[in-house]
Swiss-Prot record:
Family to which the UniProt record says this protein belongs: Belongs to the mab-21 family.
Source organism of the structure: Aedes aegypti (Yellowfever mosquito)
SMART domains: Mab-21
Name of the protein described by the UniProt record: Protein mab-21-like
Pfam name, any one: Mab-21
InterPro entries with a match to the protein in the record: Mab-21-like_nuc_Trfase, Mab-21_HhH/H2TH-like, MAB21L/cGLR
């Protein structure tokens, strides 16, 4: 099909503008965040080293590899999450019966004695490994470690929460979350994935993602509120970061996410935090299904993909529902106020309209 020259000219301008935006704004943001991560990780590593001295079951999985830290996730430019992997989940069965969308429990295997578990004192009378009890013990250890840490003048434990959150230099919050890595298994609640007859992701990539597995996190969550208090304390949150990152390899997918995060920081940091990086990542995965061919993820198409994601976001905000990519029964807008969602919808539409109607939009964004 012949494309009119004026359309090619518009597309070339858009590609140029997006590349310029990436070089000037996105890479600046990434550089600033990398600098902050290096600064805070030195302090967090020191705290976790002291924790490990007191309690060898809690081993730091925050490691530096080729100049980058693995095991830390950027939630916002000032809020980070470090996942601390625990050892020896083996004597427990993973129970994912759908009664707690987005969560699961770990139950002592039939015939296994409590004494066979490394985590014996955290097992409830019903045989569940309690996420809350492990977190409570870890909280105590971190509080003691902060007092002994050489950086104690610049790090404090955030009070009035069961979660372990460190405030560093009065500016950055780092949440440290105990977790189990579940490799070689896939949750029943995500068994429908991938949807049949959609060419993306390729079966080889699906097999890779499923063998990589998922994580179980010990953290407070809006998805558990209002449930049985005991179950809420024992339950672990399903977490698919590794799987999601694996799916976003190839083409301009990760670059697209970096641009979305930069636009979010600059234009969608709104009251009530209705839009997070995770919402954007989720909608990017849905956009990958809608546009399965690799040719649809090159430099020439990135403007269309950004618009597609923002239009999806407007629809989700107006319907007040954003389904999790792997667990669609889980609404990622749960707990967000309708007013905040309505306000966000207007801001996203303004941003989307700007990108759609002006080839110079990225100069102003």
């Amino acid at each position: 099909m012949l494309v009119p020259p004026e359309m090619i000219a518009v597309q070339s301008k858009t590609v140029f503008q997006i590349n310029k935006y990436y070089a000037e704004k996105v890479q600046l943001r990434m550089g600033n965040i990398a600098r902050v991560i290096r600064e805070i990780c030195k302090i967090v590593q020191e705290v976790l080293r002291e924790v490990e001295v007191q309690e060898p079951r809690f081993i730091s999985s925050l490691v530096e590899c080729n100049g980058r830290f693995e095991g830390i996730e950027v939630v916002t430019p000032n809020f980070f999450e470090v996942v601390l992997y625990l050892n020896q989940m083996g004597v427990f069965n993973f129970v994912d019966d759908g009664s707690l969308p987005g969560a699961a429990v770990l139950k002592l295997s039939d015939g296994r004695k409590r004494s066979m578990s490394l985590w014996v004192e955290f097992i409830t009378a019903s045989g569940y490994l309690s996420a809350r009890k492990i977190r409570s013990r870890f909280h105590t250890l971190v509080a003691q470690a902060v007092e002994k840490c050489p950086y104690r003048e610049m790090v404090k434990l955030v009070p009035d929460t069961t979660e372990v959150k460190l405030k560093i230099r009065e500016r950055y919050i780092v949440q440290i979350t105990p977790a189990f890595k579940c490799t070689g298994i896939w949750p029943r609640s995500a068994a429908h994935w991938p949807i049949p007859h959609i060419p993306w992701p390729h079966p080889a990539l699906v097999a890779e993602v499923k063998s990589e597995g998922f994580d179980l996190l010990s953290k407070e969550s809006v998805i558990l509120q209002g449930k049985n208090a005991n179950i809420e304390g024992d339950a672990w949150i399903l977490h698919f970061t590794e799987a999601e990152n694996r799916l976003l390899q190839g083409g301009y997918r990760k670059r697209c996410l970096s641009i979305l995060k930069t636009l979010c920081d600059r234009h969608l940091d709104l009251p009530g935090a209705p839009i997070t990086y995770y919402h954007l990542k989720t909608l990017l995965l849905y956009e990958c299904e809608k546009h399965p061919r690799e040719a649809e993820w090159d430099a020439n198409c990135i403007g269309d993909r950004l618009n597609g994601i923002f239009l999806q976001m407007i629809s989700c905000l107006q319907n007040r529902r954003c389904p999790h990519y792997f667990l669609p029964s889980l609404d990622l807008f749960k707990g967000k106020s309708p007013t905040a969602l309505d306000n966000a919808s207007k801001h996203v539409w303004k941003l989307c309209r700007e990108i759609l109607t002006s080839t110079k939009a990225f100069d102003r964004l």
